[in-house]
A protein has these predicted regions:
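Sequence termini and other peripheral, non-core segments
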Residues: 5-80, 84-198
């Protein structure tokens, strides 16, 4: 980590349903705590969807795997999306996302005073990680799933920024319309100061 990130090519058919891993810090817990209130609620679902792609459909259909809110077995949602591909590149990537998701579910409970429905699935993922169709390997640099028309890409720093700073720029330029921290966490210092990088 700490290297300049390389954007994965985002195919038009995968960006239609945007998924992301908001790596606002290399530390998975800190990255969760930095997310705005809206993302804390939304990303619990997306991270569960990303982690589901690590398991075969037959494993997801087994009786011990928690069902969706509608009572159906979990399916693979957008498995060719860059964030899904990154999650499955190595067990280290998967473990980073598990730690990040765990911290995000904690944030959800802190900010909204209730348990998120997907938390049971995350617990199942942790218990069954060795059933995942993911090879052991090192943590790779985060994928950047930010569309080409995003405002942050017009910032002269974007092309040379680390993955963390690219996502911070994304927050600063593209998420300010709804990025609020009103549920028990202050906005991160870098967001308050609109500053990224060293």
């Amino acid at each position: 980590l700490g290297q300049i990130s390389i954007d994965l090519y985002i195919r038009p058919d995968t960006i239609a349903t945007v998924m992301n891993i908001f790596c606002l810090s290399e530390d998975p817990t800190e990255a969760a705590q930095m997310q705005c209130d809206k993302h804390v609620a939304k990303m619990c679902v997306e991270y569960s969807q990303l982690l589901a792609t690590c398991f075969s459909l037959s494993r997801l259909a087994e009786d011990d795997c928690p069902r969706t809110q509608s009572g159906n077995p979990r399916k693979h949602f957008n498995p060719k999306h860059p964030s899904s591909i990154w999650t499955r590149l190595s067990k280290s990537n998967m473990r980073w996302l598990i730690r990040h998701a765990t911290a995000l579910f904690d944030e959800f409970e802190l900010r909204f005073n209730k348990k998120h429905f997907c938390r049971d699935f995350l617990s199942w993922v942790i218990l069954n990680i060795y059933d995942a169709d993911v090879e052991e390997g090192k943590l790779t640099d985060f994928s950047i799933a930010i569309s080409q028309d995003s405002l942050c890409r017009q910032d002269f720093r974007f092309d040379f920024a680390s993955s963390v700073d690219k996502y911070r720029l994304y927050y600063i330029h593209d998420k300010k319309a709804f990025a609020k921290w009103n549920k028990g966490r202050p906005a991160p210092e870098w967001y308050q100061n609109m500053k990224v990088g060293a």
